[in-house]
């Protein structure tokens, strides 16, 4: 990856940043995609008020163990590529921090790693994910409240379910693998875990949900949001969009007295 020119948040093109882990000329580079997707997610009201986060593993790059992570406490719609943290799996070695950038870029803010980092790492190590998305979607929060006495969210017989992967444990390797796509008659089950005062304290509950629900590609956090992962960033994006559609529909069905599953499930 080549040295690149990146924009300061305040003044465009004021600094050239010599950084081998960034590449301004590649629109599909993880650092650039994170910024693009964060703006898209902001427009969908999924990452407002600095909430939420996203990380991408460079699965198609020279080192597929590199993970790019958006920082904490930053307005996601204004995020710039040079603001990324980079860690290397499996040891989670920190290779890059935006705090090492020139003072003209960092003098007004001390960057912190995303509080979602240990949860993102859980998705990479337990599911070999290529990207992990965390949003504060109101649809996710509402479903967690409407299913307040449940530890699972369920919905079936909805066409949009077909956008989600059908997952199964490979008996030989013990790993969860995609074996196809869910079908109209399939029942989607998402685990719901309880929120905690601090994001990182969700890690154990998330890991337990990932372990106990090999068929899921997402976990709902009650009164908080959702974590979604996929084999690459584009799959994770599709899964997140499909799930948000289903969660919004489920809220409307619940409020209208329509069951989200059928008696034949």
Swiss-Prot record:
It is an enzyme of class 4 (lyase). The gene is MDE1. Catalyzes the dehydration of methylthioribulose-1-phosphate (MTRu-1-P) into 2,3-diketo-5-methylthiopentyl-1-phosphate (DK-MTP-1-P). InterPro entries: Aldolase_II/adducin_N, Aldolase_II/adducin_N_sf, MethylthioRu-1-P_deHdtase_MtnB, Salvage_MtnB_euk. Substrate binds at residue 116. The keyword Metal-binding applies. This is Methylthioribulose-1-phosphate dehydratase. One of its GO terms (biological process) is L-methionine salvage from methylthioadenosine. Its main location: cytoplasm. It catalyses: 5-(methylsulfanyl)-D-ribulose 1-phosphate = 5-methylsulfanyl-2,3-dioxopentyl phosphate + H2O.
């Amino acid at each position: 990856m080549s040295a690149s020119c990146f924009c300061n948040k305040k003044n465009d093109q004021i600094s050239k940043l010599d950084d081998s882990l960034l590449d301004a000329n590649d629109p599909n580079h993880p650092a650039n995609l994170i910024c693009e997707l964060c703006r898209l997610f902001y427009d969908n009201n999924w990452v407002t008020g600095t909430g939420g986060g996203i990380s991408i593993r460079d699965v198609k790059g020279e080192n597929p163990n590199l993970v790019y992570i958006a920082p904490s406490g930053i307005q996601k719609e204004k995020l710039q590529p040079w603001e990324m943290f980079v860690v290397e799996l499996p040891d989670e070695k920190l290779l890059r921090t935006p705090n090492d950038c020139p003072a003209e870029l960092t003098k007004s803010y001390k960057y912190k790693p995303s509080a979602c980092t240990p949860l993102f790492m859980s998705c990479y190590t337990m599911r070999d994910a290529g990207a992990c998305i965390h949003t504060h979607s109101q649809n996710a929060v509402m479903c967690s409240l409407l299913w307040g006495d449940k530890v699972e969210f369920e919905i079936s017989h909805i066409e949009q379910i077909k956008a989600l992967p059908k997952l199964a444990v490979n008996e030989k390797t013990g790993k969860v693998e995609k074996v196809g796509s869910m079908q109209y008659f399939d029942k989607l089950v998402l685990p719901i875990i309880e929120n905690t005062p601090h994001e990182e304290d969700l890690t154990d509950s998330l890991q337990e949900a990932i372990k106990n629900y090999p068929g899921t590609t997402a976990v709902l956090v009650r009164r908080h949001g959702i974590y979604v992962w996929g084999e690459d960033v584009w799959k994770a994006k599709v899964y997140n969009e499909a799930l948000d559609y289903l969660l919004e529909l489920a809220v409307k069905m619940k409020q209208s007295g329509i069951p989200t599953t059928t008696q034949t499930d």
